[in-house]
């Protein structure tokens, strides 16, 4: 059982960071809508880090990275099948959350720079990987509430890229250790966001 004080400390830190993320989107759209973007980014990071963790585990004895295995034409279908069997989806190495963050914060040149369209493609690739598999029922439409082409995120691709990029970087700062976390980050984040936005709506209503 998680230590109560540790849980509370983690929950408080998560609440502060989620509030900061919410402020990035505040004024762009209704609170009930932008929570979908925050939850969508958090969930994508969760799925991505599950992939990272699983691939590191199964490839350890082979002495290759996920990137190296995926780049090999013979190895790629093998790791894709492993991922589908174990996780129910495939996230390509270039679409891993950590690699998208690198393109936002440490891009090497203009061609390497992050675009909101990269994130949109990453999500489409993930959902597409489940087609024809049992897991498609769980993933089909899962990210539909996160409309990355919505003009309220920004009138131009550059504006939307800036907005989503800032949210993603803030989400990357959340303590998200899947092995050591004292509590359910996804579930706790959802409950905190519901509380934050209910409070926000109450203030507007009052």
Question: Model-predicted segments: where are they?
Answer:
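Non-catalytic, mostly N-terminal accessory regions of nucleic-acid modification and defense proteins
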Residues: 1-206
